[in-house]
């Protein structure tokens, strides 16, 4: 969560003659992606699973298209499959688009204007082997078109990609018209996301049988070695209905809080299930139903007495492998099957988004993990694992479950690396995402049948170092500064390469320096081809460069690792966007009168703007993609009053959330992540629990993803002479002076191109050759540059090469 004041010449050696394409105008597939039906085999049959895929850009390995351990998604045994996807695209320009369908097996593509019945065949290629088929068609801007994609794969491995291009839009995979991510839930007791189908995965550790305040001996996986009680929840927001209880061993079960009754073979045993009832000696398992009639406001604690792990074990030896499968819905008499991993209510919510940020899932605000061996594992008795002196979220959840959730829902992942995590942890994290895991360690190569599969090949990985290390309300801010000081005092650190003595500056530099190192470690696993295409490191700062958190980090990264200050710090100079794909900040907005005396007054007062404009200009200046890690409309912050909670759920909150999302994109934002999935808070999209999803905020989100995103309206249109006043303060000092005093000092402008073409960029500096021109993060020329610019936003930066300094007052762009 955010700090609750939300309203607030060596370098020239890497010149290149062309620049990368900027993001084209808003367009793509709506509703969060393509809805796909997957069927085992190539001869038809029942759908094995359905998933909304963010994009069709697959490379399938032996693990198959599913990529998870839930029965429907366990596809490593498939020798082939059929896929049928349906989605609606909206172009932003009226022109001829060329659709491309690349495949390794039989593939077809059909199109129709939305609202009509007849399909037009664009591509139908039944041949096998790698091929790319193309078909051109005139499309009208703003008109929705339905696409249907058919694919049959006769082997375990294969590939499928759907893209398009036009005279003004470079070739690209068809992606979301309105990308919108969500900050996911936390796998801890009482979290109202209730992500797991098995409630025991989010329970506290087993405790004393007659006193849960007493710790007891547990085995290496967290199972009790004696009689015990499991604290299942301690607030009354869980579902009524039938829970399925199963475990290895025997025990007498007691519902200490009297919430319901235990049932076996149609017979009720009340709040106490006698030992041996429901026990199967052949499998050494006990099974029963727990029918919860009223959760009220009370806790749920289940006692296990007279325990025996095996028939030969002593009485009082504990149990293992407990599962308490939730009802399928509130009040339902049906429960999830024991092998189902996730609560369908949770995955249903996630299906509307294009990415999931796992900051809270990984317990980042208080996570002091250093080594791989300290992490939570999928085989642990619970994912809620408190550690003394860590934060309330404990260790966070297992990475294997994180990957499984992304694969089951078809969503990109945003992963945060804990503050203290060492290089080995990062390397193993990169391998787990690439190859999967055996439950303890990641594989080092692709596996035919991985225990826990790798991330599916169409999904992106956004990697961030920790979370809000600028925020003094979190302990990791001071801890990061202490790490920076220790590093400098140890000697040989680049953090004070220029003689800087401020501990605050060292700490700010350390954030981006560690992000750079994480980027290098991922590159070592994924290779150059995987970086920025699949793996996308991001650097997030305080709103609009508050406290110079963007300027300090980005300037340091290029001055030291890019030799931009004219000194040979490193043998191979790199631009910031070699290490980073994205940058940005939070994008929260709130009411202009959050403490008004009525809900109506709170919501009628208008709302603040997000800081996205300031974040976009910094991202564009360094060739990064703007990423809003948390945001949306909220009233009350971390501690809302009862009235403010009502305001967050009032009907008018729909318009407020819509305005927040629209302004994010209008101010140049690229990819916003809403905070957060569910909760009885100011932030919850589903609120108060995951079962209440028809909220005004959710209505706004559904509206946003059903159309193309608003086009930005703040950047300076070119060709034009752009004044110094429009440089937005993007330079190291944070002040606009017009004079670049030191080698490496810079100014930057964010400009907008309506029609792609050839442009000439220069300045009114007396000696233009004293300036390196940098476009979208890439140095392109000294003094003047002529080249092609695509439609959309571009960052143009000029960097001083002269020790005598360079003065200028205009950026001049002609066509």
Where would I find each of the regions flagged by the language model?
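Extracellular/secretory pathway-exposed regions associated with glycan biology
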Residues: 27-183, 719-742, 746
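Short beta-strand-plus-loop segments that form exposed binding edges in beta-rich domains
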Residues: 148-157, 306-308, 797-805
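Extended extracellular/luminal ectodomain segments enriched in beta-structured repeat modules
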Residues: 90-98, 142, 240-242, 753-760
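Edge beta-strands of jelly-roll/beta-sandwich modules across compartments, strongly enriched
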Residues: 155-164, 316-319, 804-813
């Amino acid at each position: 969560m955010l700090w609750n004041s939300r309203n607030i010449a060596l370098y020239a050696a890497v010149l290149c003659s062309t620049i990368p394409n900027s993001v084209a105008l808003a367009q793509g597939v709506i509703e969060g992606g393509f809805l796909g039906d997957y069927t085992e085999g190539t001869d038809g049959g029942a759908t094995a699973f359905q998933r909304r895929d963010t994009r069709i850009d697959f490379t399938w390995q032996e693990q198959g298209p599913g990529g998870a351990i839930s029965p429907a998604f366990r596809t490593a045994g498939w020798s082939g499959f059929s896929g049928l996807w349906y989605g609606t695209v909206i172009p932003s320009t009226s022109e001829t688009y060329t659709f491309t369908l690349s495949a390794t097996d039989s593939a077809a593509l059909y199109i129709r204007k939305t609202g009509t019945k007849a399909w037009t065949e664009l591509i139908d290629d039944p041949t096998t082997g790698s091929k790319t088929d193309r078909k051109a068609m005139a499309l009208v801007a703003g008109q929705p078109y339905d696409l249907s994609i058919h694919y049959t794969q006769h082997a375990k491995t294969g590939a499928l990609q759907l893209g398009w291009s036009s005279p003004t839009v470079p070739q690209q995979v068809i992606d979301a018209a309105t990308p919108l991510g969500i900050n996911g839930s936390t796998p801890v007791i009482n979290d109202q996301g209730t992500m797991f189908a098995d409630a025991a995965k989010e329970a506290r550790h087993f405790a004393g049988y007659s006193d849960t305040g007493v710790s007891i001996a547990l085995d290496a996986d967290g199972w009790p070695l004696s009689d015990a009680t499991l604290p299942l929840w301690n607030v009354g927001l869980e579902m009524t209905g039938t829970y399925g209880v199963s475990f290895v061993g025997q025990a007498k079960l007691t519902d200490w809080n009297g919430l319901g009754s235990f049932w076996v073979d149609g017979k009720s045993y009340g709040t106490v299930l006698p030992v041996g009832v429901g026990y199967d000696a052949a499998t050494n398992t006990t099974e029963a139903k727990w029918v919860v009639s009223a959760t009220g406001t009370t806790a749920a604690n289940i006692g296990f007495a007279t325990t025996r792990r095996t028939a030969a074990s002593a009485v009082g030896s504990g149990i293992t492998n407990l599962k308490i499968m939730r009802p399928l819905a509130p009040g339902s008499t049906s429960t999830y099957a024991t092998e189902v991993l996730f609560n369908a209510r949770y995955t249903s919510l996630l299906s509307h988004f294009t990415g999931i940020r796992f900051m809270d899932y990984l317990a980042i605000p208080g996570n002091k993990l250093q080594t791989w061996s300290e992490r939570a594992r999928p085989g642990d008795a619970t994912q809620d694992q408190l550690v003394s002196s860590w934060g309330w979220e404990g260790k966070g959840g297992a990475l294997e479950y994180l990957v499984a959730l992304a694969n089951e829902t078809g969503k990109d992942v945003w992963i945060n690396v804990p503050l203290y995590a060492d290089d080995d942890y990062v390397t193993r994290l990169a391998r787990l995402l690439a190859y999967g895991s055996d439950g303890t360690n990641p594989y080092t190569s692709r596996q035919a049948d991985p225990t826990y599969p790798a991330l599916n090949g169409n999904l992106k990985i956004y990697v961030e170092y920790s979370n809000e290390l600028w925020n003094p309300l979190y302990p990791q801010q001071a801890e990061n500064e202490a790490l920076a000081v220790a590093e400098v005092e140890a000697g040989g650190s680049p953090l004070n390469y220029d003689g800087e003595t401020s501990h605050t500056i060292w700490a700010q530099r350390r954030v981006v320096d560690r992000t750079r190192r994480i980027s290098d470690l991922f590159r070592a696993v994924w290779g150059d081809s995987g970086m920025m295409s699949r793996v996308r490191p991001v650097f997030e700062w305080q709103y609009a460069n508050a406290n110079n958190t963007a300027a300090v980090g980005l300037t340091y990264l290029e001055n030291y690792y890019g030799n931009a200050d004219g000194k040979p710090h490193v043998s191979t100079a790199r631009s910031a966007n070699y290490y980073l794909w994205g940058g940005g900040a939070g994008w929260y907005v709130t009411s202009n009168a959050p403490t008004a005396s009525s809900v109506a007054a709170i919501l009628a007062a208008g709302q603040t703007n997000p800081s996205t404009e300031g974040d976009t200009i910094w991202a564009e200046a360094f060739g990064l993609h703007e990423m809003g890690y948390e945001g949306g409309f909220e009233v009350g912050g971390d501690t809302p009053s009862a009235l403010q909670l009502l305001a967050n759920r009032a009907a008018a909150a729909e318009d407020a959330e819509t305005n927040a999302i629209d302004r994010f994109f209008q101010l140049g934002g690229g990819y916003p992540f809403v905070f957060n999935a569910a909760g009885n808070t100011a932030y919850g999209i589903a609120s108060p629990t995951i079962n209440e999803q028809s909220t005004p905020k959710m209505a706004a989100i559904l509206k946003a993803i059903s159309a193309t995103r608003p086009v930005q309206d703040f950047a300076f249109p070119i060709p034009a002479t752009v004044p110094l006043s429009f440089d937005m303060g993007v330079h190291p000092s944070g002040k606009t002076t017009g004079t670049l005093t030191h080698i490496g000092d810079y100014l930057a402008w964010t400009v907008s191109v309506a029609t792609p073409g050839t442009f000439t960029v220069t300045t009114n500096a007396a000696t233009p050759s004293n300036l390196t021109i940098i476009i979208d993060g890439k140095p392109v020329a000294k003094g003047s540059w002529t080249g092609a610019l695509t439609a959309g936003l571009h960052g143009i930066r000029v960097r001083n090469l002269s020790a005598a300094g360079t003065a200028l007052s205009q950026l001049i762009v002609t066509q």
